[in-house]
Amino acid sequence: MIRKFIPILPLIAALFVTFSCDPTKNNPEVKDTLTVSPASLEFEAEDASAKFLNVTTNGDWSASPSADWIVMERTSGTGKASLPVKVKPNAGEDRTATISFSGADKVTVSVSQKGRNIVTVVANPDSFDGTKRSSTTYQLLIYSFADSDGDGVGDFKGIQSKLDYLDGLGATALWLSPAHPTPSYHAYDVNDYSTVNPKYGTEQDFKDLIDAAHAKGIKIYMDYVLNHSGTGTTWFKDALANPDSPYRNYYVFSDDPSADVAAGKVDNYGGGKNPGMGDWHSVSTGNKGYKGRLHYKLDWNAKTVTVTESTERAQSSNSDAKIWLFIGNDGCVGLYQTSTNVYEITYDTDTTWGFLVRTSTTTWDGGTKWGGDGKPISFGQPYALNNSTAADIIFGGATSYYFASFAQSMPDLNYGKYTECENSPAFQEIAATADKWINLGVDGFRLDAVLWIYQAQIKANQRFLDQWYQRLNATYKAAGHTDNIFMVGEAWEGHNTEKQYYKGLTSCFEFDYFDALTRALNGNASGYVSAVNGFISDHTAQRADAVTSIFMSNHDQHRAAESLGRKLEKEKQAAAMMLTTPGKPFIYQGEELGYYGKKDGGDEYVRTPILWDKAGMDCAKKGVNNKVDNTMLTSSISVEAQDADANSLLNVYKTWSRLRNIYPALAEGTMSVAPGNGNSIAAWYMTAGSQKLLVIHNTATTAKTVTVQDNTSRAVGLLGTATLDHDALTLGPNSSVVFKL
């Protein structure tokens, strides 16, 4: 029998190799592993996206979340996997949980989710240290602010009685409307710069007001009208009556304006040929008398005299006359009777003043002198005689003209050539009156209509204002003050013109400011900071000590509330924005109460008196000739009503003015852009020394959320509503917040 040999050794070797290639099954020292990465997951409160865990293993695995807010599509498997993990929205506090993995190893992954943690912002400002630093001025109209004696016209004592109110508004100064005697209610046609209007009280009353205001840290600024006076000044009346009057050069007179302007003789034009605004007004000045041949006809029945120019042969005086003319230096000239009670003469007349009619040559008594009523005679027209007034019968004055930038009742003052304006009699006299008020205690001046002093000629006006400022600042220093006098000019023009007036004054009203503010309130908030900083940098480029005076409206404009659409929330935010802006803010009488109105029916309607109580018993309506809008001036808009309402516009002004007094950064700081600016978000920093504040305004009518990286733990100012969710700040409609950093 034959046996076959089967080679089994290679088979054994192959099997050995096969089993040796799986170390986990054939080598007890090599184990499977389980790894999961990352080791932690972090989610936002409203995070809807998935985050992924990477599982690495060759074996089986399982996952177990410790909380039901963790959502996993798979919780078990074999081998490698990429696991999406989501979380449910978290409306509560921050939370953490784990995902435990089992398999070759035990692995724990931590999962955290931020809560919404919505914190309602509450303002907690520092205490007021008693130092008033807000640099906030309240503009008031003496005639309509407060009436102390019940005559319906505001007065000095009325203002003094309301100083606590003004102090509560944070005012550091009061700008008073012109305080001088005047024929008008508004007082911009001054008749005497050296005294006060008796309707407002006495000079002692004014002094008492100044002293009482100073005791509360409130300065007093007078409104001074330098461009023109009223026609009732002693100066103007004398200048009209006498062409040789020493006051003639106080005003801009000309016998031939066109020729004088063309020849460059009108100093008031500042070298220009076109005044830009204003008119020449004709007047008969003085009494020019008459030299020439005249025919006189006296009708003694009608008691009239008719005078005509004549070429007939001249007559000599009638020595047998019963009635006479008294002419010039000739004395009595006898008339010839030509019919019953009619007397005539043709006479070569030479008189510098005029003539009279006399019925006696020996006495002036007993009604023997007959004259007129002071008006000049007109040739060929019967002129009525009387023996009661018996004023000289004059031939009229020379026709002349005076210039007025505004009304005929406001003749422009003349300061001569601008290069030597400080030497002009008008400058010296008016400056002397201002010296008086400084020595009485006045702290500064608002200068009216400075554009027109030299008819919008910038260089001329700059020099005049510089000389005026230097003169009065010297008086102020001599009175014992260590600071400089404050003066603000009304250069009512756009910013590019207005800024040039800082060459003459330390401050001017920025008429473009309210435009920037309204743009911010109407959807262009992101441009607010750059606009304000542009104003300030342009002013300080003119002079280092420049003060930018900002305001919403004044007595010559439509009310701010009118321009804001009478929308209370906008009015509140406008106040908050202005009072957190660098510069010197001015609050106009009634603005803090929400007064609205247009000039269309008369300026009085934007100069409404303050309604102090609901009953309106002490409202100075007569001060504006009783021209008030009674549909606006109701009890709800009164000081009494708004004081009692914590959410009133008045209390917004009080709150934000107080903040400005508390924090130097708001009153004296520099402004810089903060992150978050947008169409409806205006955000900026205010910094002074080591103090820094973050100011954010939402000007939209809906809530807006902005990310804030700064420390928001301390809010010091709040208008409307604000909440914080970590670094997400949500401001309610027309809401504002200030954080102390």
Label each PLM-derived region with a short phrase.
Residues 478-481, 551-554, 565-693, 699-703:
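Loop/helix patches that line or flank the sugar-binding groove of alpha-linked glycan CAZymes
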Residues 26-27, 116-123, 128-131, 136-138, ...:
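Insoluble glucan recognition modules
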Residues 93-104:
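A short beta-strand micro-motif common to beta-rich folds, especially ectodomain repeats
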Residues 122-293, 357, 396-421, 439, ...:
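Acidic/aromatic-lined carbohydrate-recognition and catalytic surfaces
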Residues 33-34, 52-84:
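Surface-exposed binding patches on compact interaction domains or structured appendages
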Residues 253-256, 476-617:
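Conserved alpha/beta catalytic core and glycan-binding cleft of carbohydrate-active enzymes
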Residues 2-5, 9, 13-42, 108-126:
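Bacterial Sec-dependent N-terminal signal peptides
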Residues 726-741:
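C-terminal beta-strand-rich structural cap/linker in extracellular carbohydrate-active enzymes
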